[in-house]
Amino acid sequence: MNNLKRLTKTIFSCFTLSALLLLAGCETLPPMTDLSPITVTDARQATAWELQGKLAIKTPDDKLSANIYWRHSEDRDELTLTTMLGTTVLTLNSTPNSAHLHIDGKDFRDDNAQRLLERVSGWSIPLADLPLWITGQVGPNDQVIARDSQGKPKQLTNTQTPPPWQVAFLSWQSQSGASVPHQLKLERGDLQLKLQLNQWQALGKPAILVGEQP
């Protein structure tokens, strides 16, 4: 059984059991207590954010769909995939120098999150570039193919590692005061990834009022 089929089976098993295990089986990440919701006028102002949405991955042999929760900051990423009933089936926690993946009841570690995810799942997903694309930004290895009437990217090619990633910004929305993508489609060879952002929240350090202790 290939890695994608194994994960699909894991998600299906969690879904069928979640009616019995919903209260005991759901996992939540501990709160990021040093950050709180903020409003920004440009997504580039947010060095940290969290999102909730849908993720779909498709290969010639299989496909899967899951809910995605991603909390991103400059020094930490916490990514969770769940079934539609909220049962956690995959968590990936990483820093610039370490990564921990929990999937199918097993734990895997590496010093690189993208390499770890590819080694275990078989997906070569551009985790380092996704935070830029999620916020509608263009990276140094991106070549913009088309822009919309407001100058936002519609399509780009990432040439860092061949074959290149083709990224399409299908729609945009206003979240936390900024314009961010609503739907993204990524394609590389025979791998296709679709991401829908249902909620994107900018995060920042809470303001300290005069007279308050930090």
Swiss-Prot record:
CDD domains for the chain: LolB
Grouped into one coarse class, the protein's main location is membrane
- Where does lipidation (N-palmitoyl cysteine) occur on this chain? C26
Give the membrane topology: Lipid-anchor
Q: Where is the lipid attached (S-diacylglycerol cysteine)?
A: C26
One biological-process term from Gene Ontology? lipoprotein localization to outer membrane
Location of the protein in the cell: Cell outer membrane
Cited InterPro entries: LolA/LolB/LppX (IPR029046), OM_lipoprot_LolB (IPR004565)
**Position of the signal peptide:** 1-25
Keyword Transcription present in the record's keywords: the answer is no
Instruction: Indicate whether ATP-binding appears among the record's keywords.
Output: no
Q: Which GO terms describe its cellular component?
A: cell outer membrane
Question: What keywords does the record list, in alphabetical order?
Answer: Cell outer membrane, Chaperone, Lipoprotein, Membrane, Palmitate, Protein transport, Signal, Transport
What does the record give as the function of this protein?
Plays a critical role in the incorporation of lipoproteins in the outer membrane after they are released by the LolA protein.
Quaternary structure annotation from Swiss-Prot or TrEMBL? Monomer.
The record, for HAMAP family, names:
LolB
Q: State the similarity comment.
A: Belongs to the LolB family.
Its name, as the record gives it, is: Outer-membrane lipoprotein LolB
Instruction: Name its species.
Output: Shewanella baltica (strain OS155 / ATCC BAA-1091)
Its taxonomic path starts at:
Bacteria, Pseudomonadati, Pseudomonadota, Gammaproteobacteria, Alteromonadales
